[in-house]
């Protein structure tokens, strides 16, 4: 409905490598219909999780915009950043992910970028309240 906003959680898990940032835009079909993102449409370097977008209908015709489950409605661009890689260390790391999914991504992060996703990094996330990480990290080789 017109001017109504909703939070939309992606089905896919997004992993932004620590040397990139992610930028999201609505697919042109929906942009022309009046769909817009209210929150910052970006994902920080090193972010892993499901994206939550706050979308709003700004249609000039004031008609509802229907997005069906599974319909692709956004573009996601990876942009290489300049300078030293600095991974996201915020409370939304691993948002809307199961322990099994998190464990899988931790293995990838440690294997591919172990020098960046090191013990200091994991401890900083634990301090944010992501206590479940201790249990997962000690299970890993």
PLM ranges: what are they?
Residues 1-141:
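Non-catalytic terminal segments and appended small domains
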């Amino acid at each position: 409905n017109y001017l109504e906003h909703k939070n939309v959680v992606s089905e896919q898990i997004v992993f932004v490598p620590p040397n990139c940032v992610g930028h999201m835009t609505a697919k042109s079909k929906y942009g022309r219909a009046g769909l817009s993102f209210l929150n910052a449409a970006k994902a920080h370097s090193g972010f892993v999780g499901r994206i939550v977008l706050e979308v709003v209908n700004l249609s000039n015709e004031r008609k509802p915009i229907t997005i069906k489950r599974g319909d692709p409605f956004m573009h996601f661009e990876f942009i290489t950043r300049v300078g030293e890689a600095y991974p996201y260390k915020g409370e939304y790391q691993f948002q809307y992910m199961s322990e099994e999914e998190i464990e899988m991504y931790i293995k990838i992060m440690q294997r591919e970028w172990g020098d960046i996703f090191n013990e200091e990094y994991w401890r900083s996330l634990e301090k944010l309240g992501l206590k479940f990480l201790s249990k997962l990290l000690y299970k890993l080789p």
